[in-house]
C-alpha cells in the first residue's frame, strides 16, 4: 500500500501543478480529488515536505488540511 500511496501522490502532484497553471476552477477540482481519495492531515503534511507543489497548490492543500 505504501508504494501505491507514493505513486498516487506523485501523480496528484503533477496533475495539481499542471491544473493550477491552466484552470480557473483548479481549486474545486483539487478539493474534489482529495475528498474522493479520503486523504488525511498527516498525508498532506508529509507530502508537503517531500513533493514539489506549485505555490497555489500548497495554498490549496494547507486550506484543505485546515478544514479536516
Which role fits each region the language model picked out?
Residues 2-27:
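N-terminal acidic leader/helix
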